[in-house]
Amino acid sequence: EFIARTKAAGAKGIRFYGICCSGLAAMYRYGGVIPLSNAVSAELVLATGALDLWVADVQDVFPAIMDVADCFKTTVVTTSESARLPGAIRCEYDHHHANIGETQALARRIVNMGIEAFTRRRGIPVHIPPYEIEAEVGFSLEYIAKRFGSIAPVAQALKDGRILGIVNMVGCSNTRVVYEQPTQVVTDILIKNNVLVLSNGCASFPLMKLGYCSRDAFTKAGDTLAQFLKPDLPPVWHVGECIDNARSSTIFGALAKYFGQDLKDMPFAFASPEWGNEKGINAALGFRLMGINSYHCVEAPIFGSKNVIEFLKHGTKELLGSSMNVNVSPEELANLIISDLKAKRVALGWAPTHAEAQA
């Protein structure tokens, strides 16, 4: 029905693109949704002039969205009562989702508005950067078991040092640092030192864009990690959207169980180089509660109390077995992570590196 209506309007069809975690969630659940960017560059995506309709839920509702959309006659629709934009069309659930039964009607209305916007926007200049890349996504404990037959091959590579350690690289982007640079730099140093990286949410976008999630990206990794990944596994395993941190924790948990060890004793780490909001603190604390250290290039936005920041940074070491580590230098932060992973290996009685294990 809608495809026919679209073609009658002169278009070839309907394409869906995604920003941030809403886009990743749709891609993972339905397919056919192409991820474009994380939240911070939302306006840049709009400024291509390529989008007929922009629909937002509770994220990416930035004030400048309407200014950019007006320049390109893009229709903006908000679907959350608590996240509206002046001038946007409201097509939303109420606060209690009492009208959840109207979902199909709301969706049909939005698609029709997109078709109308296409007709209205004829002649609008479009500039799409001439760059695209393929990324391998969908890693999970279940996929690992399917790919390798069990968790054992990954566990053995971890123990013998081919994989030095595993880091969950996540978090939002932050305008207080060079956009996406800390995430990319830390990741690059880690994989060159044979650390396997898991990623999801906003932090995964620069890693996808720069090829770290591509099947031939094992060439970016250190020798022993590349040996493990060949011929077609990337050094960064994409596990989903922001809330899919849970997939990383299940992978960590399965490996710890394989060795009969507590999570806090395993060579694992949580890195969120660019975090910049409350949910980032909560995500880090989720892993800290499991005894896994967190690492950041930006201080947590909790400076209302010196006692609170000192407790969250260092006071949790005895209580949880983990600490918060901050260094504004991505290079130094990456090296600290590597050093701490090696210390965990030594405490387990494992060689710090594969070369030392072979000696």
Model-derived features: positions:
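Anaerobic metallocofactor- and corrinoid-dependent redox/one-carbon enzyme cores
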Residues: 1-359
